[in-house]
C-alpha cells in the first residue's frame, strides 16, 4: 500500500481557504486567465465533454468568447468535419477520442489529411491503462503538435505513467460527478475524496492537471486551483442552461434540463456496463451569465488570496473543517 493513502482524505465541503491581506482595490483588477496549451483562456473552467453538456453550437460560442471546451466523442463519424468547421471559422478545435481499434484509423486519417486539432482528450473512465498509454504514444507520434490530455486517473503513479508516455496534461477524477455512479457500482473511485486525490496527483505532476468532477459551488473552482488544477471540468453546473443540449422539461411549473452521465444507459443505448445515471437539473438561463458569475467569484477568490492572479490562490493556507462548512446554510 502506498504511503500517501495513509493521509487524511477530504473533499470540497471539508476545506476552507484562509484569507491573506488584500492588495487590490477592486476584484475587477484580478486576472483569472489561464494558459492551457498554446492558448490563454478567460477562466480555468471547461464544460464536461458530455453529450448532455456540450454540442457544436456551444463549442463555437465558447471558442469565440475565449473559453476552453472539449467536444464529446459520442458521434465519432462527425469529428473530422467538426475540426474542419472550427478551422473554417478561425477557431481552435478540441475533440475527444477513445481507445478502440477504430480510433487508430481515425488518428491516421487526421494525420494523412492534415486535419490537425489543436487539442485532443483521451476520454476513458479508467485512464491508468496500458491501452491509454499505447494511444498516447500513437497520437504524439502521428500528431506531435496537438496538445494531448489523457484521463481519467486518480493516483500519482497514473500521472507519472501518462506524462512519461507523452501526455501534455492529465485529467483527475474517477466517479465523483453527480451523474456518475462508478463508486456505487464498482466500489472504486474518488467520490468523497476528489480534492485529496487532486492534491496527491499534483505532487507528482510536472504538467497541467484538469480536476474533473465533484464541483457543486463556484468556490470549489478556487479550491481546485489551490490543490493543483490548471483547469476545472464541470458537468452538472453547466447542464441546465438554455444552450445545453438536454431537453427542457417543465414539472409543476418548474423548468429542468435533462442531464446524463457518459456511461449511462441513455448514453450507451443499452443496459450494459452502466456506470452513469440520468437526472434533471434546474434550468439556469443563459450560460453566459453563469460563466460571468464564475469569473467574478474567482476574482473575489484572488482578492481573498492576497494576489492579483490565479497564482496567489495556489499558495494560500487551508483548514479542514469536516462537513461543517454548510451547517449554517441548510
Curated annotation (Swiss-Prot):
Keyword list, A-Z: NADP, Oxidoreductase
Oxidoreductase keyword on record: yes
Gene3D superfamilies, A to Z: Aldolase class I (3.20.20.70)
Gene Ontology terms describing biological process: purine nucleotide metabolic process
EC identifiers of the protein: 1.7.1.7
PROSITE patterns in UniProt: IMP_DH_GMP_RED
Top EC class of this enzyme: oxidoreductase
Coiled-coil ranges (or none): none
Pfam families documented for this protein: IMPDH
Keyword field contains NADP: yes
UniProt catalytic activity: IMP + NH4(+) + NADP(+) = GMP + NADPH + 2 H(+)
Active-site annotation: 180 (thioimidate intermediate)
Molecular function per GO: GMP reductase activity
InterPro entries per record: Aldolase_TIM (IPR013785), GMP_reductase (IPR050139), GuaC_type_2 (IPR005994), IMP_DH/GMP_Rdtase_CS (IPR015875), IMP_DH_GMPRt (IPR001093)
Positions of NADP(+) binding: 209-232
Transmembrane parts of this sequence: none
GO cellular-component term (any): GMP reductase complex
Record-stated family: Belongs to the IMPDH/GMPR family. GuaC type 2 subfamily.
Function: Catalyzes the irreversible NADPH-dependent deamination of GMP to IMP. It functions in the conversion of nucleobase, nucleoside and nucleotide derivatives of G to A nucleotides, and in maintaining the intracellular balance of A and G nucleotides.
Protein name (record): GMP reductase
Amino acid at each position: 500500500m502506498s504511503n500517501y493513502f495513509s493521509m487524511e482524505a477530504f473533499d470540497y465541503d471539508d476545506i476552507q481557504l484562509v484569507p491573506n491581506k488584500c492588495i487590490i482595490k477592486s476584484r475587477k483588477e484580478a486576472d483569472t486567465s489561464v494558459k492551457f496549451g498554446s492558448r490563454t483562456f478567460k477562466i480555468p473552467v471547461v464544460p464536461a465533454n458530455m453529450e448532455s453538456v456540450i454540442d457544436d453550437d456551444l463549442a463555437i460560442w465558447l471558442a469565440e468568447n475565449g473559453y476552453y471546451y472539449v467536444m464529446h466523442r459520442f458521434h465519432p463519424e462527425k469529428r473530422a468535419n467538426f475540426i474542419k468547421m472550427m478551422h473554417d471559422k478561425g477557431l481552435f478545435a478540441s475533440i475527444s477520442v477513445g481507445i478502440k481499434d477504430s480510433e487508430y484509423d481515425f488518428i491516421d486519417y487526421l494525420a494523412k489529411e492534415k486535419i490537425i486539432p489543436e487539442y485532443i482528450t483521451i476520454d476513458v473512465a479508467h485512464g491508468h491503462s496500458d491501452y491509454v498509454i499505447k494511444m498516447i504514444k500513437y497520437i504524439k507520434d502521428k500528431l506531435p503538435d496537438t496538445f494531448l490530455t489523457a484521463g481519467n486517473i486518480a493516483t500519482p503513479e497514473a500521472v507519472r505513467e501518462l506524462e512519461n508516455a507523452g501526455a501534455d496534461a492529465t485529467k483527475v477524477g474517477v466517479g465523483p460527478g453527480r451523474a456518475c455512479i462508478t463508486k456505487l457500482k464498482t466500489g472504486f473511485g474518488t467520490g468523497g475524496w476528489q480534492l485529496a486525490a487532486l492534491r496527491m496527483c499534483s505532487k507528482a505532476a510536472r504538467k497541467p492537471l484538469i480536476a474533473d468532477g465533484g464541483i457543486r459551488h463556484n468556490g470549489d473552482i478556487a479550491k481546485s486551483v489551490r490543490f493543483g488544477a490548471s483547469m476545472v471540468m464541470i458537468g452538472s453546473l453547466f447542464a441546465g442552461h438554455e444552450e445545453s443540449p438536454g431537453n427542457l422539461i417543465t414539472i409543476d411549473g418548474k423548468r429542468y434540463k435533462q442531464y446524463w452521465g457518459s456511461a449511462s444507459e441513455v448514453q450507451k443505448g443499452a443496459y450494459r456496463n452502466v456506470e452513469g445515471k440520468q437526472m434533471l437539473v434546474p434550468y439556469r438561463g443563459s450560460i453566459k451569465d453563469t460563466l460571468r458569475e464564475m469569473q467574478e467569484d474567482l476574482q473575489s477568490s484572488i482578492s481573498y488570496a492576497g494576489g492579483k492572479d490565479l497564482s496567489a490562490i495556489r499558495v494560500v493556507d487551508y483548514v479542514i473543517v469536516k462537513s461543517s462548512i454548510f451547517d449554517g446554510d441548510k
